């Protein structure tokens, strides 16, 4: 029976939220796509996470998608609906939270955007990342959706006129309506917020990133089951489709310490047919040989593409598809390494190649 329905705006978000419950031992299912027929789960599933792929949609379309999913969950009488947001507050935050509130039919949505374990906290109404306001952080320079405001209410009001109210640490939500934005700087703060919501029986409509999601298993009293660890090969192939500076630095550090690194050129990663050709086959042969001889090998896209094209979303999808096709060829050719995929789009590209829609 589904106790919790999570709506994420991208695949990375769906996974980093789903893992909060899977690691606890709750039966968790992550589904890609918003076709309602695909959202049914077996009787053992406690947590259903859907990747709605709304991060890069126009705000109105994101609103409609979230509204429809929340209505589905209400009709199924699921006890808790969680609108997962990006921990840096990128994406259609205002449109999606207002849609969730409207579809729910209640008067309050409780939003806890902090993720203290990643040094992302909300203080005085401002969202801080690594100690600086969000718009001044690395996410203010995001090539796809830069964060342009640091005050949470300003971010919400970019896309909605729904009422917002800020709840400071230790403050009361009494008499407040709309999207309630909670201050949280520590895991203890988040646990206290969860306890307050439980005491008031207001756990039906929540929002936040994977940080607040981590307190939900206890809050919702999800049952725990034993999980066996997966056996891993001692060799590692890191496949990086992310353009996050931290990910790129990790690839550079691995190379500096002796790991063979294979980087795609802009032309290769943006081509629709290069991954299926002979030149790609030669490179993949070299990757396979390196994987059989070295403990760590890196295959990456070489960072952002300068002046790649007007349609950045199409470029992003094509790059993910190229990496997915390359990785499938490696697996088909007998790759015997543990694969670390960096970037949700990259993993989604592989899943498309394998015709897999859920995990």
What is each PLM-predicted segment?
Residues 1-5, 27-31, 46, 62, ...:
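Cap/lid and interdomain-hinge subdomains that line or gate substrate/regulatory clefts
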Residues 7, 49-51, 83-84, 110-115, ...:
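Short beta-strand segments
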Residues 24-47, 281-295:
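N-terminal short beta-loop-beta anion/metal-coordinating cradle
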Residues 33-37, 56-72, 319-322:
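Glycine-rich, highly charged phosphate/nucleotide-binding loops
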Residues 44-60:
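Short, structured active-site "lid" loops
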Residues 342-359:
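Conserved, well-ordered active-site substructure
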